[in-house]
Amino acid sequence: MSTNGGAPSQKRSWLPSRPLLTTTTQTYPPPLLPFKKLHAPPTAARRSLPPAASKPMASSSSSSLPAAWAAAVRAWAVAPALRAAVWACLAMSAMLVAEAAWMGLASLAAAAARRLRGYGYRWEPMAAPPDVEAPAPAPAEFPMVLVQIPMYNEKEVYKLSIGAACALTWPPDRIIIQVLDDSTDPFVKELVELECKEWASKKINIKYEVRNNRKGYKAGALRKGMEHTYAQLCDFVAIFDADFEPESDFLLKTMPYLLHNPKIALVQTRWEFVNYNVCLMTRIQKMSLDYHFKVEQESGSFMHAFFGFNGTAGVWRVSAINQSGGWKDRTTVEDMDLAVRASLKGWEFLYVGDIRVKSELPSTFQAYRHQQHRWTCGAANLFRKMAWEIITNKEVSMWKKYHLLYSFFFVRRAIAPILTFLFYCIVIPLSAMVPEVTIPVWGLVYIPTAITIMNAIRNPGSVHLMPFWILFENVMAMHRMRAALSGLLETARANDWVVTEKVGDQVKDELDVPLLEPLKPTECAERIYIPELLLALYLLICASYDFVLGNHKYYIYIYLQAVAFTVMGFGFVGTRTPCS
């Protein structure tokens, strides 16, 4: 009997009442229907059809099979996985924008507080040191200072750092200049040694030190330098990389913070760049590093008295180094390693942005890639090695542990490099080809816009470069993500160390001899970066699909990304040496 008004009951078919897959642009038939031939007419009717009428139906049925299966795979496998990736990226984006907002507000508060009461630490000007030409017993307020200059085949810049260090204003009997030369080129070693001898002839207390091997790289050189008897007599150590040129009053400005505040272990100063206007890539680097110093270092110093040591242009208290275990070479970020360990011992750090030290930015794409790999991979690897040590530490507060684990390491050193590439270069382009997945506008537009605005606020003079900065950083995100994963997983390349190439002058043509060996014709192929070009092809496919068949309208952004990856894939970024 029927249950709907006496109508005869019918046997319920297992076929669905509507197509299994429905999108905003096209409806697909159930993928199993062609196998069962459920759409075929009865045998008698099929026999009555003319041949011309039956052939198109067979062709349509066979041609719909691949499309049906592709739609099924997309809807049942790709879409759920992509949707999960979208929400994971949105969660990480929220973490990143919250961290950026917190750091931005803290840095603005630090800037306001500095105008009212300075840096919050006692600082008193030092008495004039004795004349270098007529040495006299130095006042007791001038402690022994060691100036370390580690270098490795620095033919282009070794004179800059040595000359600047020897010109520092400090009693000559209270300062020691230590040049740590790990050069493997005998000619360069001879040049550096002759330069040290020349300054020694001018009554400068300078020491030239070499090692039999490069074990530990920079960390090993610094550690070996501290083992010398004369170095153990020093109370403080200033460190400058080979391309850094401190002003003569550097010690007179930084040392009072250390002398009058015994809890301070490190005074970090800001980098200034002599070659930032060489090319677009160096201008973009300056934007990123200015944000790093103005926001990350300033907020860390103001809120937590902690930040990552930048490896150069800073002055350390020797007792803090010794108490923290000295220099370790377990990662490629020995500077950050020492800073974290010193912080866990209760030491405080101070960032003084008013003191600037001239330095050089890498101007070739290859050199910049190596530098970013070392920094990103080393930081992620240090997170892996020190996470449990931070958790179990009993000498610092829970608030500082939270800052170290979550803000300093997890968000900035792990989430940031992975999210930028995964979300903006993989997930968003792929979603343009999957209409079942929609990204909320707040995650697609509002969050990246907020991050860009916060960066622009602290770099008002570089607002016109923001579009180029976004595209460049997204391309570099691929290398940073690979480096971060390499560090987190501690792969074979986790401890690769490549010294950043330096040129020593903004204009090479003004020099009598070339600073770099001309590239051989076969080496020109090294300018082609296959990963960038492959990703450019992927982005081009996604953008073209969205333009022709899609409805997300992401193609403008994706096309721009494809252009950026193509340009950098062929090496058309930074300075270039012509092929011979």
UniProtKB/Swiss-Prot annotation:
The chain crosses the membrane at residues 85-105, 414-434, 437-457, 528-548, 554-574. It is a multi-pass membrane protein. It catalyses: GDP-mannose + (glucomannan)n = GDP + (glucomannan)n+1. It is found in: Golgi apparatus membrane. GO terms for molecular function: glucomannan 4-beta-mannosyltransferase activity; mannan synthase activity. Residues 15-27 have a biased composition (Low complexity). It is an enzyme of class 2 (transferase). One of its GO terms (biological process) is cell wall organization. Its EC number is 2.4.1.32. Residues 1-12 have a biased composition (Polar residues). Keywords: Cell wall biogenesis/degradation, Glycosyltransferase, Golgi apparatus, Membrane, Transferase, Transmembrane, Transmembrane helix. Residues 1-33 are annotated as: Disordered. The active site is at D182, D335. GO terms for cellular component: Golgi apparatus; Golgi membrane. The keyword Ligase does not apply. Substrate binds at D241, D243. The keyword Transferase applies. Belongs to the glycosyltransferase 2 family. Plant cellulose synthase-like A subfamily. Probable mannan synthase which consists of a 4-beta-mannosyltransferase activity on mannan using GDP-mannose. The beta-1,4-mannan product is the backbone for galactomannan synthesis by galactomannan galactosyltransferase. Galactomannan is a noncellulosic polysaccharides of plant cell wall. This is Probable glucomannan 4-beta-mannosyltransferase 2. It comes from Oryza sativa subsp. japonica (Rice).
